[in-house]
């Protein structure tokens, strides 16, 4: 038997789940070939739910992430068909949980599409990225909403929130890094805050421009406590313009202040708080107490990520402007354009159908009129013949 025939028989045995036949064929040198769609024996075993056959093939060294001609892996097959046990054994053997097919859909997308809740939970457990978007800009959560599956939607929503909380680099989370240079533009020119603050001690320093900076030490409380402490500490700074500028250091106690480095800068008629701590997230910031603040405070993030203004008599709430990623915005625009084009085409098609119906109706009216004229002529002939017959009888 040729190698080609052995390869074909191996595919058939894997499809049928014949473990012994698979072992015999591999022992006889059957190659791991694919069919015309690029489907390997492992694809077939995973697709048709043959757990033991899948294990035999994996132990024999069949590629766990083999791709078909549409880039589907065995994990895609098993997840799409809802074979949770096969999904798990593939993942345990190191299958790529976030592999994408030609539609940029992962196993999680396919499991959600076919409402396989057990498989969805298993994929999330093994680290599937719930934020991944398909070619149609759909996450697994979007698909569950489209399918009306509330249970899956809830599971995926919780998973999305958990991944955001454990991933500080999530696009919806504001994170500030200490490596970003800090500059304040004041009446005296541009001031580099990095040079104003010592790297070790909590201190207050002043430069020649009259801009003062306060740096606080480390702690483990929330950013809200940080800004509250900074607000209280800023009260004496509001009168800094009335006192002579000195180059001495003044230690400030801030045990409740969070983060590695916090800076308060007073310049002109306002105070600027710049948070330069590495890894601080402002997701839990709601309001800042304003007692003791005599002038506005501006909290500035690096690169202009966020600006929070606290008037002296108001309580400011965090405002986070979250823009869609450029790729998603482009996808949304493409979808909107497609919808608009589809509506225009539909209107044009309806108008064509209406025009065609009007033409048909006009044609039928003309035919009816012609028939009526023929009927009238025939009736007149009958009347003439009747009169003629009557006259003959009278004679």
Swiss-Prot record:
The keyword DNA-binding does not apply. The keyword Chloroplast does not apply. Acetylated by EP300/p300. Deacetylated by SIRT7, promoting heterotetramerization and activity. The modification N6-acetyllysine is found at residues 69, 352, 381. Changing residue 295 to A: No effect on transcriptional activation. Minor reduction in activity. GO terms for biological process: mitochondrion organization; positive regulation of transcription by RNA polymerase II. It is found in: Nucleus. GO terms for molecular function: transcription cis-regulatory region binding. The modification N-acetylserine is found at residue 2. Transcription factor capable of interacting with purine rich repeats (GA repeats). Acts as a master regulator of nuclear-encoded mitochondrial genes. (Microbial infection) Necessary for the expression of the Adenovirus E4 gene. This is GA-binding protein subunit beta-1. It comes from Homo sapiens (Human).
